[in-house]
């Protein structure tokens, strides 16, 4: 029977992580469980840096960006000896189960703990929206608003100078954030990992737009696709139009979470406690068609596929 749980945030931070922690803590306390907060993700778990959390520990947290528990990347957690120390720390603290909030790297850590018999629940916290088994991740909608606002501002100056602007958006190897922001921001061209990219084809499309009378354009591109400064230089050379690249960077991860992210995080946090009390471990939480769902975390990582929104891409092309 579960009496005490731990909660940690891991990997890149996302707006709404604090709301998720709050959801976990308050739901657990309501059910009579104790909660230990673990600082700095798996690193803090390995180093045994924890704190007991009560209702007041998470007061005034629902609207705050970032994560008050801190986060860190800790690739050393792949080492079974490191994980053995982490498990020993959990047992020493009397922790019976763990809630992990983060992206796919965080899920891998939870998967490894699950494989050696420690109950874990994963909550999808990442702006990339690249987690399998869920329509949306905690932080995605806040980041989307941040990116669209940046695109709106870039359009103002691009229009003034009749310039081509390239905006690089986070997402790692998933184009969801780029695609949604590009549609909402009215971008003329979209470059995402799921669709084959050729810079000569992009230039041809830009030239076609210029021939139709377009005075400026915005190209939205997912990070890691190419060097955007080099791409800007190439476009300017081929089109004769001034072209500048803007890398939005970590500003996309910050800021107060929008209402949907707060609600999603709160619901998922409370749902994680429901699952643990029902005897579920080794699960990851998602939302599909606005209904909370849970999947086997090992199956989700190893077997599930995340479909690309090809219909969104087709829509975007019609709006160029």
Curated annotation (Swiss-Prot):
Keywords: Allosteric enzyme, ATP-binding, Cytoplasm, Glycolysis, Kinase, Magnesium, Metal-binding, Nucleotide-binding, Transferase. It is found in: Cytoplasm. ADP binds at residues 22-26, 55-60, 155, 186-188, 212, 214-216. ATP binds at residues 12, 73-74, 103-106. The active site is at residue 128. One of its GO terms (molecular function) is 6-phosphofructokinase activity. InterPro entries: ATP_PFK, ATP_PFK_prok-type, PFKA_ATP_prok, Phosphofructokinase_CS, Phosphofructokinase_dom, PKF_sf. Its EC number is 2.7.1.11. Allosterically activated by ADP and other diphosphonucleosides, and allosterically inhibited by phosphoenolpyruvate. Its cofactor is Mg(2+). The keyword Thylakoid does not apply. CDD domains: Bacterial_PFK (cd00763). Coiled coil: none annotated. GO terms for cellular component: 6-phosphofructokinase complex. It comes from the Bacteria. Pathway: Carbohydrate degradation; glycolysis; D-glyceraldehyde 3-phosphate and glycerone phosphate from D-glucose: step 3/4. Mg(2+) binds at residue 104. It is an enzyme of class 2 (transferase). Belongs to the phosphofructokinase type A (PFKA) family. ATP-dependent PFK group I subfamily. Prokaryotic clade 'B1' sub-subfamily. Catalyzes the phosphorylation of D-fructose 6-phosphate to fructose 1,6-bisphosphate by ATP, the first committing step of glycolysis. Homotetramer. This is ATP-dependent 6-phosphofructokinase. It comes from Salmonella gallinarum (strain 287/91 / NCTC 13346). The gene is pfkA.
């Amino acid at each position: 029977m579960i009496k005490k749980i731990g909660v940690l945030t891991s990997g890149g931070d996302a707006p709404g992580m604090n709301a998720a922690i709050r959801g976990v803590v308050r739901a657990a306390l309501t059910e009579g469980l104790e909660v230990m907060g673990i600082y700095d993700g798996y690193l803090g778990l390995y180093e045994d840096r924890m704190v007991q959390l009560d209702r007041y520990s998470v007061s005034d947290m629902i609207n705050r960006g970032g994560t008050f528990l801190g986060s860190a990347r800790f690739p050393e957690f792949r080492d079974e000896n490191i994980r053995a120390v982490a498990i020993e720390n959990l047992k020493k603290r009397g922790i019976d189960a763990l809630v992990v909030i983060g992206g796919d790297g965080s899920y891998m850590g939870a998967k490894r703990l699950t494989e050696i018999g420690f109950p874990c629940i994963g909550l999808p916290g990442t702006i990339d929206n690249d987690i399998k088994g869920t329509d949306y991740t905690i932080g995605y909608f806040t980041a989307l608003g941040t990116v669209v606002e940046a695109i709106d501002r870039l359009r103002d100056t691009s229009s003034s100078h009749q310039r081509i602007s390239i905006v690089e958006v986070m997402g790692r190897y998933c184009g969801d954030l780029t695609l949604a922001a590009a549609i909402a921001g009215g971008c003329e061209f979209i470059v995402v990992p799921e669709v084959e990219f050729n810079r000569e084809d992009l230039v041809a499309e830009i030239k076609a737009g210029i021939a139709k009378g377009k005075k400026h354009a915005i190209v939205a591109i997912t990070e890691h696709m190419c060097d955007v400064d080099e791409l800007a230089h190439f476009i300017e050379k081929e089109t004769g139009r001034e072209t500048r690249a803007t890398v939005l960077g970590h500003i996309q991860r910050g800021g107060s979470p929008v209402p949907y992210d707060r609600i999603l995080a709160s619901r998922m946090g409370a749902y994680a406690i429901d699952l643990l009390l029902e005897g579920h471990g080794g699960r990851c939480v998602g939302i599909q068609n606005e209904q909370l769902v849970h999947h086997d975390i090992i199956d989700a990582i190893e077997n599930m596929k995340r479909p690309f929104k090809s219909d969104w891409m087709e829509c975007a092309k019609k709006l160029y």
